[in-house]
Amino acid sequence: MSLRFILGRAGTGKSRACLDEIAQELKGSPQGPPLLFLVPEQATFQTERALATMPGLGGTIRAQVFSFRRLAYRVLQEVGGSARIPIGDLGKRMILRNLLEKHKDELRLFHRSAGQPGFADALAGALSELKLYNIDATSLDRCQTEVIERQGAGLLADKLHDLALLYGALKTFLEGKYTDPDDYLHLLAQRIPGSVMLRDAEVWVDGFAGFTPQELSVLAALMSACRRVNVALCLDPTELDEPCDLDDPFFRTRETQAKLLQLAFDRGIVIEKALHLVPAPGQSAPRFQHPELQHLESFYFRRPAPPWLGGTQSLFVCAAANRRSEVEGAAREIIRLCRDQGYRWRDVAVLLRDLESYYDSIESVFSDFGIPLFIDSKRPAPHHPLVELIRSALEAVLRDWAYEPVFRYLKTDLVPLSRGETDRLENYVLAHGIRGRRWRDREPWLFRRRLTLGEDALSEFSDQELAELAEINGARDRARAALASFHKAVVGAKAVRPITAALYQLLVDLKAPEQISCWIAEAEAAGRIEEAHAHRQVWAAVIDLFDQIVESLGETPLDLATYAVVMEAGLDSLKLSLIPPELDQVFVGSLDRSRCPGIRAAFVLGVSEGVLPARPKDDGIFDDKERERIYALTGLELAPGSRRRLFDEEYHIYVALTRASERCYLSYPLADAEGRAQLPSSVIARVRELFPQVTERTWLLEPGSLPTGAGLSGSAFAGAATAETAAMAQTALAARTTKEAAMSAVERELAEEYIVHPARSLSYLIPSLREALARRPVPLVWWAVYSWLAERPAWRELLARVLSGLWHKNREQDLPKPVSRRLFGDPLRASVSRIERFLACPFSHFISHGLRLKERRIFRLAAPDLGEFFHAALKQFGERLRRDRLDWGALPREELFRLTGEVVSDLAPQLQNEILLSTARHRYLTGRLQQTLSRAVIVLGEHARRGQFRPLALEVGFGPEELLPPVQVPLTGGRWMDLVGRIDRIDGFFVGDASWLRVIDYKSNRANLKLADIAHGLKLQLLAYLDVALRHGNRLLQGCALGEDRPSSLSAATACHPGGMLYFGICDPLLSTGGPLTRDEAERAILKEAKMCGHVLADPAVVAAMDGQTRQGYSPLIPVGLKKEGGFYSASSVLTMEQFALLRQYLQSIVARVGEAILDGLVSIRPHRRDDRLACSFCPYKSVCQFDLLLQDNDYRLLIDDPPEKIWEKIAAGPKAIFEGVIR
């Protein structure tokens, strides 16, 4: 029984010496006593591989590789102690959460923090630390007593009391049934003397810089039980007799050697002569193939140190703009090494101190470059379908089958629905607001959306509707079956075990195990071994999570909401530990845990200030001062504090600088992910000090500008087709003499650095091709890249797609006239809003009315729904007044409120499948709608009281099978266009045998109408409605029901004149005043806010018929101001009879031109821009047209608001000048 050290600095061959000695033993006696190689957990696979590939060994069972944890499993299986149920980290946290609640009255300090997120994690970490350092509850009690005796009660004493209490409670809970994995090494140390396997065994220990007290106990037991224990440590054997300071990189290993020597001395273990691995004078260590790297290893931590004279060929310092360019630069250099220097992927390692920040960039960039890699890091699995299924199933039950969790559940591909069925089901659910009971009951869904409010419900479904409903209900039954059973099982459950059992039954009902097995088989068949392994691990981890929850909380009373929180924490903690799927791949690891022996080139990324060396975090139960006080007062040793961990960073730096045998790259980004400037680490400064002429590089994301040299002019390239361009480039290259075509040194350097992978080279090629399109010269190297890609079938298609993007013009070709007429109909039938849409952008009109694309319907109360509701309500209100022969202006307020209440009660259930009755919020909104409607009818009543205009018709339709015929607009070639629509309200005023008509359009918010709006074609509705009313005025007058107000002089010959065209905003305005108002003042202010907008006839008599109480000043009802001496203020919105006539002619011209353009197939992408208002702002088809100002053919059609005089001139000239950009 003896102890022997194998000592040497980095690269001297310590690991190789261990392997060689094991190999020698195996060759000498293949059947002898066991040979154990003890290494860190993360190094077991690499060490097993190294041992298995030792030349001349073949298969053996005598030599085995173990980590401390794996050795514990093996020994406990042999001598007993492994039968108890292990409790993992999650189980321990849940147990501690229960113990905190159970003992909260006894806790002195922790009761305040017990419910805080993360506290149970911190507490579990503290107890694990105590176990690793062999401190039990009794020791904590003694420590607390000594602290109180020597410095009195306080925060530290209370911490120690609570920790001792919870430590003891945890031990009592686990005793006799469960095993804490943190106790495995303690049990191992106790069981080693009884192990037959370890008798006469020889042990090699390698890869450790230090050991916890638990691990030291195991090593002490091994020294007593085994024939010999060999421990390899990284330190300088020539400096063993010299003092070692805390900032020495070998301080930790020197300290570790001292502890092992003391353990051996205390147990009477023979200490053999150490094996010192020291290079001969003037020679490099076996690892380092270049003296520069040996110089770096020898002198980095020595001061003063001789600088390296001359440049470097194996040491490089690289600066990058950001992390992405840093990773891409490393990827390009790795490919260059493998392409030009004979490296294999496995000869390269990428090392980082902060792997998490670089993880996503490395994974995506290396994949783009085609570099196989293995990232030595446990990966979270929060987005795996199985994890998402569990999370969303619990959330669906808790949120009463709300849309979001239900469809996250259905989209996991673990539910027996195809993706198409899921999409159709989702559309139906969104359109009808289905949730809760409607999902769970067995009644079939027969919802359908009404087209307009107030229509009678259709009694029968069409055959197509029945088929669609049958498909929807079939998909719904399969979607709900398993989840409904789960819901029924867990709703009444009050303990952990039945809820977990129901969750497992849900997976069984869905046949999740079988589906995951299929995914594994598919992945393996496609060669995606890593993906298959991930599926296996996730399933195993989820089942283990269920076991942990049941074992730790079992019959603990827990409601479903709390259970979901516990399960969420467990799912978030799932990590995937992946074994390298290939032998030849780049290794990516972190400096503090990964081992990567035998590499030729190391890329150390992220060598930035604050990252390497890393800033220690002090986030445990004990801070640094408390750790020092505990040690000073009681002698109990805890884990190193942040100050000591900061010095340990020096060892990580030493490891990083000495991993590679041939090349070491140190790189740093100049900015972080948010664009903030970052400084290089002190490591960079020290390397520059030690190597004044170190080779420095800059890694750019894309190649910078180059001299064009013998580059091919882009003028010939511009506008050419793909095949023509290929021939052109080939001809140009072949035609040049050798001297002319030779690449410059700069270009060749560029080619060597950036042209390393076809896909990435193609992305770098694109900017150069853009330069060619702009008729600027392009460096010859990019034409060479172009030719290489064009000559190879594997890349030719991708190149063609890229080039098609360069020539892409986002410009739609007009439709052939026969196609357009079949698509839009001939004769064309169009509403005024359709005309306005075309004038806003022809392509938007094509999508909405040609292809008839519609946005997905969603069960919510949007602005159009409110508009529809108010239109229907005012129509119904007006019809009731007409039916009961009531005068709008004479009704008292109480009667108005009663009538609006009845109207709202009648219409509310009809809006979107009772949306206004669906929730308390919507029921409250119904009351607000009634209040707004009441305010509107009060204002309209004021119009009736103060004026003489009376409603002639409400909701008047014009078109086929409507009250009024469509407006037939003649087009060229004998064609015509039918203009159709619906007018909210037409009012009339009569004097003798003449009448004046005005049209009113209801808006759910305030709207304005400027002359420029009409001129630009943006707001034509009011003008078109007035034109229709005037065309059919006599028919309206004959059919109206004015009752006693109907003048006897009305006849078919009555002349109809334009009275006005007005918007009425339906709103309940919120007043902003400087002080309190009386009731009358408030009413006047509200009336002013609800003033109609638009244009009225410039006739005082007509104005008086609209507001007879305003003799001078501005009317509170209409947009008119009267001067005292007569006439109108300039701000009045009035038009003369001639101007109304001119606008009507202008309207006819616009409609005719638009009709011609539609039937001629005009579908151009030409949105307008008016000041800062864009046609695209509220267009639902932006993703379809892909309008982009960066594209040459995409630009806005600018609309400029001219002064009124100039607008009238243009209106008189017709629409040609104004709509030149839209209509040909």
From Swiss-Prot:
Pfam families: ADDB_N, PDDEXK_1
Keywords: 4Fe-4S, ATP-binding, DNA damage, DNA repair, DNA-binding, Exonuclease, Helicase, Hydrolase, Iron, Iron-sulfur, Metal-binding, Nuclease, Nucleotide-binding
Record-annotated UvrD-like helicase ATP-binding domain positions: 1-326
Domain UvrD-like helicase C-terminal: 283-584
Swiss-Prot/TrEMBL cofactor(s): Mg(2+); [4Fe-4S] cluster
Name the UniProt record assigns to this protein: ATP-dependent helicase/deoxyribonuclease subunit B
Binding, [4Fe-4S] cluster: 841, 1176, 1179, 1185
Binding-site positions, ATP: 8-15
Gene3D superfamilies (alphabetical): 6.10.140.1030, P-loop containing nucleotide triphosphate hydrolases (3.40.50.300)
